Amino acid sequence: ARLAEHGVEVIGHVRSDEGQSLLDSWLTVIRLGRPHVTVKWAQSLDGRAAAADGTSQWITGPAARADVHRRRATADAIVAGIGTVLADDPALTARDVDGTLFPHQPIPVVLGQRCIPDDAQERQHPHPLIHRDGNDLPLLLSDLRDRGIQRVFVEGGPTIASAFIRDALADEILTYIAPTLLG
């Protein structure tokens, strides 16, 4: 409006979707006072995140895993629950298809009251691990914001994903559906 008032021709809303995408995390911090949260989960066609016996650590294929790692590399922090950590021992890093670390690594955040084993992969992460009980997600996000974190990638199991969605803290939901049945 100010440019137009001074005689400058203004064409509005050009590539506004792309601009919004670039600004999402910053705008979330400004508008809501917390980081932009992406909640990710993978499921089978029958809606399961894992087989009953826990043997399905990877239910998606290589393309989905590569996409997840690319998205991890754009996040400032990656959140997982202690159940996922104890069951799968994820590295919580962003890696290329050949296994090398991307230059930018998200800070690992583990939620839950149980202890993280001394030999857990999360303890080998390039950034120090943040371990919180996860009982107050708005407080967690406030703490992360105070640390300069603007983009959070939630990659826990159904309990953690549901908690962020239930508390209306998910700005983006990313679901990968594997072409398989686990039930």
Protein language model features and the residues they cover:
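Active-site proximal loops enriched in glycine and acidic residues that flank catalytic Cys/His/Asp
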Residues: 82, 156, 174-178
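A short acidic Gly-Thr/Ser loop motif
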Residues: 156-158, 167-168
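Short, ordered loop/turn segments at secondary-structure junctions
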Residues: 15, 114, 178-179
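Zn2+-dependent cytidine deaminase-like catalytic core
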Residues: 1-18, 163-165
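A gly/proline- and charged-residue-enriched helix-loop-helix capping module
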Residues: 20-24
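Active-site ligand-binding patch in enzyme domains
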Residues: 25-32, 36-153, 159-162
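Residue-level detector of structured alpha->beta connecting loops
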Residues: 7, 75-76, 169
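Flexible, gly/pro- and Lys/Arg-enriched active-site loops
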Residues: 167-183
